[in-house]
Amino acid sequence: MTKAVLTSISQLALKALLYEVSLSPKPGLVDRFDNGAHDDMSFITFIDSMIALSPFFQAYIETGFAYAKEEPLLLFNRLRQLGQKAEETMFCATQGINTHKGLNFSMALLLGATGAYLARTPHLMTDLGRFSKEDTLAICRLVKPMTAHLIQTDLGHLNTKKEFTYGEQLFVTYGIKGPRGEASEGFTTLTDHALPYFRQMISQNDPETSQLRLLVYLMSIVEDGNLIHRGGIEAWKGVKADMRLLLQQDLSTTDLRLALSSYNQCLINQHLSPGGAADLLALTFYFAFLEKLL
């Protein structure tokens, strides 16, 4: 019974990734229609990546459930070790293409936290109904003590390094903390912004329109390391401003799709891809499934 419940929830994480890549059109991003601003990956690359990651999603939630009483740092270390194996498997499946590295990191923590939360709230195991927004908040808050050390440990000693990863370079150049920052703050972009916005949208619109509007909203607020890496601070600010204007227009679903298709070409021409917003879109979908908003 327990394993079946944990399996069903881990499948919601996979479903969230499938919904994210399938949502179309997404400016600058891989979707059903085209590869956005990416010349090294496609919709199929993402499918290959998700299949590779899926068994690890189950391992994350089972680890959180099994070690719920463990010190947060010890649980983090278990999840990170699993996450590194998942990353290696992903790169093998995609021939070295980074499709979900940051998202895998975040999912490892959130699925681990979900497992730990379920171990502490057994009624959710016996009656898998709708998770409340309070449940969502509690799960995200469990990540904070697991990752309180992360910025200092991972990014605090970069002055001694000569070669940087993509994420380290963003921190050194711009102070962008990326997924580590989101995690160490308890995913406040999710709990304070993305999910409240999506709950409102889904109460007023059909699911696809709500998802597209959520993407635009995220592009208007997220500190997007992918955009900054590709185009610099000014390009990122420009995208945010454009998306704020698009939100203000309150377009019909048809006109919104047309506007996003047009903006997709703009971002392709500039080689810009809002990958940070895409990751948070998928994480929002995961909790939307738990709360039965979708």
From Swiss-Prot:
Molecular function per GO: ATP binding; triphosphoribosyl-dephospho-CoA synthase activity
The kind of enzyme this is, by top-level EC class, is transferase
Q: Which Gene3D superfamilies match?
A: Triphosphoribosyl-dephospho-CoA protein
> Carries keyword ATP-binding?
yes
InterPro entries to which the protein is assigned, alphabetical: CitG, TriPribosyl-deP-CoA_syn_CitG
Q: Which UniProt keywords apply?
A: ATP-binding, Nucleotide-binding, Transferase
Q: Which GO terms describe its biological process?
A: prosthetic group biosynthetic process
Q: Does the keyword Nucleotide-binding apply?
A: yes
The EC number(s) attached to this protein equal: 2.4.2.52
Pfam families for this protein: CitG (PF01874)
Which reaction is recorded as catalysed by this protein? 3'-dephospho-CoA + ATP = 2'-(5''-triphospho-alpha-D-ribosyl)-3'-dephospho-CoA + adenine
Q: Family per UniProt?
A: Belongs to the CitG/MdcB family.
User: Matching NCBIfam families, A to Z?
Assistant: citrate_citG (TIGR03125)
Q: What is this protein called?
A: Probable 2-(5''-triphosphoribosyl)-3'-dephosphocoenzyme-A synthase
